[in-house]
From Swiss-Prot:
CDD domains per record: TNF (cd00184)
Residue stretches of biased makeup (Basic and acidic residues): 1-21
Low complexity bias (residue ranges): 76-96
Residue(s) at site: Cleavage: R159, S160
Gene Ontology annotations of biological process type: animal organ development; canonical Wnt signaling pathway; cell differentiation; cell-matrix adhesion; cytokine-mediated signaling pathway; gene expression; hair follicle placode formation; immune response
Domain Collagen-like: from-to ranges: 180-229
Residues in the Extracellular compartment per record: 63-391
Record gene name: EDA
One cellular-component annotation, GO: extracellular space
Organism classification: Eukaryota, Metazoa, Chordata, Craniata, Vertebrata
Protein name: Ectodysplasin-A
Length: 391
């Protein structure tokens, strides 16, 4: 019990059932009984367990080997040339890490300190140590050459560093220590002086010239605030002429009291025996010979007329027209009772848009009629109402 023994793997008892299972179970397509099927599954279970144990042993072996390499490498870096264990061999346990797994295994109690189980015998100490090293060399056959090369490299480094000075060993010891975690970042240093000004850069490519086309006008802005009232201007002189022009212009013509027979006394049937009662000379002009009334100013005019007629056995109705530039504008017709000499009046009126230089007149339609030019019953006139409305 004081030293590790080589594990002796005896043949598993499941080998025999494997043969039996291969012969009796239905692995090759033959029909198998229920008992043979159970033995086949039992064999497969033992086989899987054995394979898992082999894999676990292999993993432990690889872990032990890597741990031993790390310990040997660390010891060869820190130990001197005369220190035991730097020879790179496994001839003595002193070359191993005292805290390593192999050293702990070797440092177990000796057969004198541990109780023996029944049937075990003790070995001498020399034979025990030799047996232990043989086991280690058996498991790790390649560690010997690796350790020897490592020890030679350490000796060469020691010789080269001994000539460097008194600080050499201290630096080697510092280099051999494991580096701790990095500390926190220090505060930033002061800014350095400004560097020299660099050369001027390459001038850029000139931009594309813009167009001279003006864009569409924007929407009108909001109205500004109302300004203060201005100073009162001087009072102007009253324009009497303007006041007169704004007043309505009137013309009124009436008969002179004569009796007229149209067929014998009138030329073209137009009445011309008029007397002026009132007339604005700036707006109207009367032509006495032709009996026409001329308009001098554009505007809207109200035109009216009345004629008194009487019957002399020639016709049974009376009719006349108000013409503008010899074109009929208004017409008035009145029937007369035959066989009597009754007097009858006929009145008409209307509004007309007239332009300057236009002429208006009263024209009789039938020639076989007589007219009484009384100032109270026969008259003709016009009133200017104002400017013509904008079209």
């Amino acid at each position: 019990m004081g030293y590790p023994e080589v594990e002796r793997r005896e043949p598993l008892p499941a080998a025999a059932p494997r043969e039996r299972g291969s012969q009796g179970c239905g692995c090759r397509g033959a029909p198998a009984r229920a008992g043979e099927g159970n033995s086949c599954r039992l064999f497969l279970g033992f086989f899987g367990l054995s394979l898992a144990l082999h894999l676990l042993t292999l993993c432990c072996y690889l872990e032990l080997r890597s741990e031993l390499r790390r310990e040997r490498g660390a010891e060869s870096r820190f130990s001197g040339p005369g220190t035991p264990g730097t020879s790179g061999t496994l001839s003595s346990p002193g070359g191993l890490d005292p805290n390593g797994p192999i050293t702990r295994h070797f440092g177990q109690r000796s057969p004198q300190q541990q109780p023996l189980e029944p049937g075990e015998t003790t070995l001498p100490p020399d034979s025990q140590d030799g047996h232990q090293m043989a086991l280690v060399n058996f498991f790790i056959p390649k560690e010997k050459s690796y350790s020897e090369e490592e020890s030679r490299r350490v000796r060469r480094n020691k010789r080269s560093k001994s000539s460097e000075g008194a600080d050499g060993p201290v630096k080697n010891k510092k280099k051999g220590k494991k580096a701790g975690p990095p500390g926190p970042n220090g505060p930033p240093g002061p800014p350095g002086p400004p560097g020299p000004q660099g050369p001027p850069g390459i001038p850029g490519i000139p931009g594309i010239p813009g167009t001279t086309v003006m864009g569409p006008p924007g929407p009108p802005g909001p109205p500004g605030p109302q300004g203060p009232p201005g100073l009162q201007g001087p009072s102007g002189a009253a324009d009497k002429a303007g006041t007169r022009e704004n007043q309505p212009a009137v013309v009124h013509l009436q008969g002179q009291g004569s009796a007229i027979q149209v067929k014998n006394d009138l030329s073209g049937g137009v009445l011309n025996d008029w007397s002026r009662i009132t007339m604005n000379p700036k707006v109207f002009k009367l032509h006495p010979r032709s009996g026409e009334l001329e308009v001098l100013v554009d505007g809207t005019y109200f035109i009216y007329s009345q004629v008194e007629v009487y019957y002399i056995n020639f016709t049974d109705f009376a009719s006349y027209e108000v013409v503008v530039d010899e074109k009929p504008f208004l017409q008035c017709t009145r029937s007369i009772e035959t066989g009597k000499t009754n007097y009858n009046t006929c009145y008409t009126a209307g509004v007309c848009l007239l332009k300057a230089r236009q002429k208006i007149a009263v024209k009789m339609v039938h020639a076989d009629i007589s007219i009484n030019m009384s100032k109270h019953t026969t008259f003709f006139g016009a009133i200017r109402l104002g400017e013509a409305p904008a079209s």
